[in-house]
Amino acid sequence: MVAIAIFMIVVAAIYSTWTLILRASQTTQHTAAEAQRQRIALRTLEDSLTCIQSFQASMKYYGFVVQNGDSSVLSFTARLPGIFPRNRKFVNPDLGRDFNLRRLTFTVETGPDAEKDLVLRQNPVLMDMDADEQQTPLVLAHDVNKFTVECWDPQKMDWVNGWETTNLIPAIVRINLVLGGNPGAGYAAPERAVTRVIAIPSITLPSVLQIGR
């Protein structure tokens, strides 16, 4: 009996150790995956913002929209490179598609597991968004605790949470992206907060230059 008791204690200790190792491995894998997603999300935001285009005479199509809060929104129009995500859907010579000028809409939405996701939808600048983009946007990051976009206001000499100058685009934006763990999955990774300051190389083309004199 004593031998059996000792054996059970050893088995329990081995199982406890194995469980701890498994949980640590899950947390490490989850953290690494989310860190990679965070890098991809920030790279996508940076690439698109540096390709932004804006025309003062057509602000209906080229407006710059920022909305911070629980359901943050960032929307603008950009001429995108060939390596941009989902580009082959919009640029395909065989199908007669050449829509590299597209409106991008980044939003924070509730995902299928009740977590907050950062998603991206795209549509050609003169066309409505199709059903596929509406229903299955590109998910850039899961477990988003915070996504804010601040714009540098040269008049206030400070960062502002919104952008009310609708006929211009900001020269500099600051993006804050905070991703957290997923306790619902049985483990919790630490929060990962990243702030990125991005200078926008474009300016809004004045109406007089667009329509001529």
Language-model features, listed with the residues they occupy:
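Extracytoplasmic beta-strand-rich oligomerization domains located immediately C-terminal to a leader/signal peptide
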Residues: 13, 17-132
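Short linear sequence signals and composition-biased patches located at protein termini or domain-edge surfaces
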Residues: 141-213
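Conserved acidic
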Residues: 6, 37, 136
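N-terminal single-pass transmembrane signal-anchor helix
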Residues: 1-18
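An exposed acidic His-Trp-rich patch
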Residues: 126-149
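A short, structured loop/turn motif at beta-sheet edges
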Residues: 69-71, 108-115, 139-146, 167-171
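Well-ordered beta-strand positions in beta-sheet-rich domains
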Residues: 98-105, 137-138, 192-197
